[in-house]
Amino acid sequence: TFRAITDKIPYLKKLGITTIELMPAYEFEEQVIPKKTVLPDYLKWESHGEDLIKPESVQPVEKINYWGYVPGNYFAPKASYSSSADAASEFRELVHTLHENGMECVMEFYFVPGMNQNVILDALRFWVREYHVDGFHLQGDSLPVTAAAQDLLLSRTKLFYTHFDPI
């Protein structure tokens, strides 16, 4: 939880750590729900009784996504990472305590291809304004990194990105 990290800050500081990077800590869907697909006609076959799978023998496959590299609600801290009902206050307290101890908070964000670039910039600005995060590690293709680096607010943060377009 965010509070558990806050409690470990003295230990992290003693180790000489100056920056923590949080994997996606914004709200995202944890339950992986498989998409139903319809087989094309050329893949359909005439089944026989012995070929059928009995419904009681099929076990549901539950997959939990703890990583966060999926589309998300980029404007809210992850509620399940909070030990209280107020994830926003708990995250704010984490960043504040890091700063009091001379440490920085960098957040990792994954944005899906084709996402509105203005929403991306707005989300990053939001986390700087609301929570005072110190930087971002951006994941995804064709992100507005140049615009972020030139933005009045975001230009004062650290930006990590590995998919720069060649000139």
Please annotate each region the language model reported.
Residues 1:
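The feature marks proteins involved in alpha-glucan
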Residues 5-26, 62, 130:
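Catalytic domains of carbohydrate-active enzymes, especially glycoside hydrolases
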Residues 9, 92-95, 145-150:
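Short amphipathic alpha-helical segments and helix-helix/interface helices
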Residues 16, 100-103:
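Secondary-structure transition into beta-strands, especially the periplasmic turns and strand N-termini
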Residues 21-30, 109-114, 139-144, 163-166:
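Short, solvent-exposed turn/loop segments enriched in Gly/Ser/Thr/Pro and often Arg
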Residues 32-100, 111-130:
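Aromatic- and acidic-residue-enriched carbohydrate-binding clefts of CAZyme catalytic domains
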Residues 42, 69, 101, 123-125, ...:
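Active-site-proximal helices and loops of the catalytic beta/alpha 8
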Residues 106:
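Active-site cores of enzymes that catalyze phosphoryl transfer or operate on phosphate-rich substrates
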